[in-house]
Amino acid sequence: MASKRYPLGIQTFSEIVKGNYFYADKTAIVYQLAHYAKFHFLSRPRRFGKSLFVSTLKAYFEGTKELFKGLAIEQMEKEWTAYPVIHLDLSCGKYYSLENTYSILNGILEIEEKKYGLKVNPIDEKSFGARLKNILLAATAQTGKQVVVLIDEYDAPMHDSVSDEDLQKTIRNIMRDFFSPLKQQEGNIRFVFITGISKFSQLSIFSELNNLKILTLKDEYSSCCGITKSELTQYFREGIEEMAEHNGLTYEETLGQLKQHYDGYHFSINSEDIFNPYSIINALDDKEFNSYWFTSDTPTFLIELMQQKNLDMLNLDDLWIQASRFDTPTERLADPIPVLFQSGYLTIKGYEKKGKLYHLCFPNQEVRQGFSESLVRYYSAQDMNRYDAIVYAYSKNVLINDDMEAFMPHLKAFYDKFPYTIINNNERHYQAVIFTIFTMLGEDVKVEHTTSDGRIDLVLKTDKSIFIFELKYKKSADIAMAQISDKDYAKAFADDGRKVVKVGINFSENQRSIEDWVIIHCNLALYHTPKSS
């Protein structure tokens, strides 16, 4: 059993230190940030360690030196000045109505007002900006120090009101007033740090903070949240070893599986690989490679917006776009890409300097598989019987019995019941759906696989077989099969050791489904020259 505990659901730095929990030391970044600028903003996905980082900043600025014993910052900080800290956590409620919004903000400010003996006249209860200003003034007057302001999940009110345009507009005005003293009282402020998931227009809330430093895409702060590989092996080695023993794997094999499932985030051009901290901690605690961060309830509006913009799994796993396309305000929801990036469904995988183009992809298997599952549920029109049927049919016929022929009627039945509203009647759409289904099932699947003789529409690899798919629209399955044979696609896999199966499928324009298919098992002996005696 591990000598330390995993901080499941714990986001308070002092509790982690005092409770002997596993902790990846981020204090060197805390010191660097504290001496960088005055106003800072950081966007990171949900459950990615933002609140813990804010809590660490709070402990540092409060001068609690004893909490940092043995950590990097202990050797860096010499003064340990204690500042008054105002911590505004906006994630502590749901902003589904004006009444809720007023109640939550009132409760947040009351906590700070009590610290400085401030009493509020009921008539001024909703004057949130004036109340924050009075807190700042009182903190400075009573301590003789500049104030540190930490704002966690600033965008929670916006996310909760996204489906009600009028409510969101009203809340935006309330929040603009709420935060207005930050600029007005700049002289009394030592440091401001604001976190959130989304990048809402700066003018919409922080209208006067024209010197706000955006840290989201900066290399030097790319690992302030999340866990790097070096941190994982340094601080969590004991847990990895236990997980390896539990699963009958080596240490390196376990590390590889953790990387495949939960690694792959990049928040800047030169960012090192970042593991999802929520998933890693839960996986190590359970000693299982399950899905933790990704929830199956991907917002329907996001998938519908993808449909409107003709975006599918094929697009999302290979996007080349400029930063202005994804690092942009999201409140209008006209483009799903910024939401997908800022929410953690997509991440930076590369950068082409000349064209200033970023390569966006899914970060890892957990997200890729989870997102495809959400899409398949959407394709199923949320009919769980259809969803369960396709999963069961694939598992039984392909994974267990290695029988693609037996699976094809089930795949056809899945297409037969597609709502017309989500069908783009073309070959690419049908290719995207098959790709999404296989991806959802966690399979090794590639589209447009390049060989010396052309590009294969789709290649599916299981433990037993390699399936080569050629898809046609308004033609015939025989024509699809002829292309596989004429271009000799199977040759590329002749030395793999698994069986190779050719699958030709034709889709009907009128039926909007699979019309016919042909399956042929390859004779791989044809590709091997007999040894001379």
Locate the predicted segments by residue.
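Active-site metal-binding core of divalent-cation-utilizing nuclease and nuclease-like domains
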Residues: 139-143, 437-463
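Mg2+/Mn2+-dependent nuclease catalytic core
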Residues: 168-173, 473-490
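Acidic-basic catalytic patches of nuclease active cores, encompassing PD-(D/E)XK
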Residues: 413-446
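Domain-level recognition of nuclease-like catalytic cores that cleave nucleotide substrates
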Residues: 492, 496-533
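Structural motif
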Residues: 148, 465-467, 501
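Phosphate-binding site recognition
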Residues: 1-426
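Metal-dependent nuclease catalytic cores in nucleic-acid-processing enzymes
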Residues: 178-185, 338-346, 435-439, 443, ...
